[in-house]
Amino acid sequence: KKVSKYIGLNETVVAQQSLEIPYAYFWKELLRDQGKTIGRLDSRYIGIDRIDAGEKSDYNPELTSWEHSFTPAINMYLRDELGYKTDLNYFIFGPTYPWDNTNNKTGDNLRQAMMQNPYLNLLVQSGYYDGATNYFDAKYTMWQLDRSGHMKNRLSFKGYRSGHMMYLRYEDLKQSNQDLREFILSSLPNPEQAAKY
């Protein structure tokens, strides 16, 4: 009952999934009764599938919008402003998926770098409506970097009322830029300060 209440799916569906709701299924199921789906990278975008049944959405509605907005814009900028001419197609999302994450030790590598460099700070910025690199996973991952709490003054986390691309919402663009500026300024060591170790 609690899982159902927290995520917005009915209790029967949650029980049928044994409390483990696959992401793709969630995006399809949340608004299924309305015949709609939600976006993966930004759940504020709504899609309509060919049929309401199924385990996953037919497409990501946010990508349709973004590809029609950003691909022509970057192609025009490259061609007209920078004078770059090519027969190659520009892809917002290239044909590199699925990535091989077999030896992905990004978190461990970052933790090691932060332990070895006392001037290395981390700012994580996350959109509440991002289902790909979602807010709570990002926060959890950051917490795992410093279970002891020894580096907590070097870790910053900011959340925004947008999806994966926070800069698409003007208020978040302004705030995330300001947060980034403040982070950079606060991360700079005093020129007179000696090395810590």
Predicted features and spans:
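Extended, charge-rich low-complexity interaction segments
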Residues: 180-197
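Catalytic histidine neighborhood in serine/cysteine hydrolases
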Residues: 147-165
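Catalytic histidine-centered segment of alpha/beta-hydrolase-like enzymes
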Residues: 132, 161-172
